[in-house]
Amino acid sequence: MRVAFLVDSVSNLKESQAQHLYVLPLFIIESTPEAETTFSSGFDIDLKTLTDKMANAPKGVKFSTSQTTEEIVRAKVSELVEQYDLIIGIPIDKEISASYANWKLVEKDYASKFHVLDARAVEMIIDWLINDIKGWLNTNPYSREGLDRFVEQYRKKTAAVLFVTDTKPLVAGGRLSNLKSFIIKSLKFHLLISFLGENGKLQFFDKARSAHDAHKLAVKFLKKQLLKHSAKLKRGAFLTTVFDEQTNTNLVQEFDKLLDHSINIEQSLLSPVICTHTGLNSYVIVLQGE
C-alpha cells in the first residue's frame, strides 16, 4: 500500500516526495495602517525573516495568522489520490486553529483514501508521530479505527511547556488578558504555558521570577503529566525563536541536567506560524513518554 503524509506549516517540515511527505501552508498576515501582506509560513517567509520584521516593526504594524482553506486542501488531496492508496492528514491541532474543520470537509469526499487524524499536535510532535505511525503500519494492518486508537494513546504521551517573556502577541491573539500581561511585564515574570497532547489546549499554568526557576517548574510539571501514562520518558525536543547558538546550547544543557541526562533532546527552530503568537525570545521544551 502506497501511503503519503499530508501536514501543514505548523509541523515545520519540508516537503519531500522521496519521503512521501507533503506540506500545505498556514498563513501569516502583516498588517499596516495602509495594507495587508500575506505570507505562506515556511514557504515564502522563514523564522529569521519573521522575527526581524517583528523586532523592527513600527507602531501600528500587527502580525496575525490564517488557516489553510478548504480549497487548498481539496486541490492537494485530489492530486495525491491519483498517486497513493492512502493519504494520512495531520493538520494543526484543532484546539488552536479552525483549519482542522476544513480538512475534515475534504475528507468526506475522499473517505476511502484520505484519513484526517485528530492528533492535536504541533511542531516536532508531528514529526515524531509520522515516524511512529510508519512503525505501527509495519506491524499492524491499516484500519481507520485502529489508527485512531493508536493516535489517541499517542496524544496522552506528549506534552510541552512554552516559555514567554514578550506577551504582546498572546494578548493580540486573545490568548492572554491585558491584566495578566501587565503584571507579568511589570514584575518581569517568565510566563509558562502548557500544551498537553491529551486535550490539545494551550493553558497558562505558572510563572517564575527567573528562567532557571521556570525551567525547574516546567520539567516537574511535564514529568508529572507524562509519567501517569508512561513508565519513562522516550525523547525530547527544544524549539526556539532565539538565534544565538550559545544561548540555545546553554538552555539545552540545563534541560538535559534537569532531566538527569535520561533522554536525547533534539533541537530545532520554532515554526514561523507559532512564533507569530508566542513572540520574540520564546522557546519550548517538548517531552514524550514511552
Swiss-Prot record:
One Pfam family it belongs to = DegV
Question: Which molecular function term from Gene Ontology is one that the record holds?
Answer: lipid binding
Q: Which residues of the sequence carry a binding annotation for hexadecanoate?
A: T65, S97
Q: Which UniProt keywords apply?
A: Lipid-binding
**Origin superkingdom:** Bacteria
Instruction: Read off the InterPro entries from this record.
Output: DegV, DegV_C, DegV_domain_contain
What range(s) does the DegV domain occupy? 3-289
**Which SUPFAM superfamilies does the entry link to?**
DAK1/DegV-like
Q: What does this protein do?
A: May bind long-chain fatty acids, such as palmitate, and may play a role in lipid transport or fatty acid metabolism.
Q: Which NCBIfam families does this one have?
A: DegV
Name of protein = DegV domain-containing protein MG450 homolog
